[in-house]
């Protein structure tokens, strides 16, 4: 494993967990060392696993993963739980992530610029909301 890249090490670790046919998968910073394409594939895999009923407990600083893949978020700051809820509640409250040193995912920021400030977990959601609003305005 020492000769593998960080991304390859992550993929081997995930494959090892899946080989055990477990109901739970624990991932520590799974997108670290992944390029954009590999990160997208990993996020898609996590969605597929979730659809199969596998519970994923993940530790991450990657807010794109949180916005797109998580159904529950626990934020720990200074050894205390400061937030426990759903991603939309975390990201839609003004400045909440920033006070803990977290960054907003680009899709969330763009969504906040649209009328009604809808929650956009990813760019596909943002584009769909944008086109929906545009279509309504053209009528």
Predicted region positions:
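Conserved ABC ATPase signature
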Residues: 1-4
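Hydrophobic anchor residue at the start of the ABC signature
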Residues: 14
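Catalytic Walker B motif of ABC-type/P-loop ATPase nucleotide-binding domains
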Residues: 25-28
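H-loop/switch region of ABC-family ATPase nucleotide-binding domains
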Residues: 60-61
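A short, surface-exposed alpha-helical micro-motif characterized by mixed small hydrophobic
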Residues: 66-68
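Conserved beta-strand-loop-alpha-helix hinge in the C-terminal portion
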Residues: 80-107
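ABC ATPase nucleotide-binding domains
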Residues: 97-139
